[in-house]
Amino acid sequence: MCQNRIMFKQFIMAGAIDIVQIDACRLGGLNEVLAVLVMAAKYNLPVWPHAGGVGLCEYVQHLSMIDYLVVSGTKEGRVIEYVDHLHEHFVDPCVVRGGHYLPPARPGFSIEMKPATLASFAHRPEKASAA
């Protein structure tokens, strides 16, 4: 699994991959993702973001939109993973209709968590030491 732009560059230049599956958790942030998107566009390879964890569907919808609007200009051959769980913990969860992500209604990366969720999963040292 490619974890940075250098690994993607080596695999792409060697012709070793047909699909660029970026992993938002493994790549070092948006700038690293942008570098990979540009390389994929140069070699005419489709990008399929991986979105398997909590909040990743909310995040990768933006990466695909950036790819379409800024880098590749195409939706042809593009796929985004979708995992239908845990969206209820987000203020502005992703919405999929007819097999397509809808653009978010609010600014940001759609990963703001609800205060009740944060409170329910907060670390409580007093409870940990009692066990």
Language-model features: locations:
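Shared catalytic-loop signature of beta/alpha-barrel
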Residues: M1-H100, P104-P107
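Extended hydrophobic packing segments that form well-structured cores
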Residues: G108-A131
